[in-house]
Regions:
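ATP-dependent phospho-/nucleotidyl transfer catalytic cores
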Residues: 23-98, 146
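Helical subdomain adjoining the active site within ATP-dependent kinase catalytic cores
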Residues: 49-62, 83, 87, 181-205
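Active-site acidic catalytic loop and adjacent metal/ATP-binding pocket
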Residues: 78-131
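A glycine-centered beta->alpha junction motif in the catalytic cores
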Residues: 1, 12-16, 42-56, 170-188
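Gram-positive cell-envelope targeting signals
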Residues: 8-11, 15, 55-60, 70, ...
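All-alpha amphipathic helical-bundle segments outside canonical DNA-binding/catalytic cores
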Residues: 27, 159-167
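Active-site activation/catalytic loop segments of kinase-like enzymes and analogous catalytic loops
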Residues: 127-158, 169-190, 194
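Conserved kinase catalytic-core helix
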Residues: 1-35
């Protein structure tokens, strides 16, 4: 995937280390922990509602049948979050690069000179944000296992970056809009597929 080569090159050529305090890491830890627990409580509440019903709709049954996948994802994220915090709490520098901050396949122009377009959201931050956004936007369209392996060969991620990426892609997202029962089935099936896909592309720690 030529796009990931451009992204890895971007991150490599713009790398720097910025000062960071324990308070900033603690703030990020708390934000991630709150997001994980909010998502967990959302799905746990629905599980408890559905399990008490005598008859379930197809979408409710789909969630009940696959709830163990969601449950395991939460505890994986919480475990990884604690490991991440242990790794970073004594660090005073954070590695950052120029990031595109909204990567999608449609923003990659491939011709004689390949390049990225739509830089409205660029900033200097941890490079895993680009990886996460690309995965979040294109996980249904691209096989990411080889893509991220290629990226890591060109721009090797630090252990704390790998853990943070794993947390982001493994946290069950929430889609609260309800249209009809069919769409509820599609929504839950998509979430399960997303979590299964995420479990295959997380970095080894």
């Amino acid at each position: 995937m030529d796009m990931i080569e451009i992204v890895a090159l971007l991150h490599t050529k713009t790398i720097s280390f910025k000062d960071i305090t324990l308070d900033k890491y603690k703030e990020l830890y708390d934000n991630l922990n709150n997001n994980i627990n909010y998502s967990f409580n959302y799905y746990e509440e629905r599980f408890n509602q559905y399990i008490q019903k005598e008859y379930n709709t197809p979408s409710e049954f789909l969630l009940l049948r696959n709830y163990s996948i969601i449950y395991e994802a939460f505890y994986y994220c919480l475990d990884m979050l604690d490991k991440w915090y242990v790794l970073v709490k004594d660090k005073t520098k954070q590695r950052v690069s120029l990031i595109h901050n909204n990567l999608k396949l449609e923003q990659f122009i491939h011709n004689t000179d390949s390049y990225l377009i739509s830089w409205d959201n660029y900033r200097y931050d941890t490079p895993i944000i680009d990886l996460y956004n690309l995965y979040k936007n294109e996980w249904e369209n691209v096989s990411f296992l080889d893509v991220f392996s290629e990226y890591n060969n060109s721009f090797e991620l630090l252990e704390e970056e790998k853990i943070l990426f794993n947390i982001l892609v493994s946290t069950p997202y929430i889609d609260e809009k309800y249209i009809n029962e069919y769409d509820e089935c599609v929504k839950y099936r998509k979430l399960i597929n997303y979590l299964n896909c995420s479990s295959k592309i997380i970095f080894d720690i």
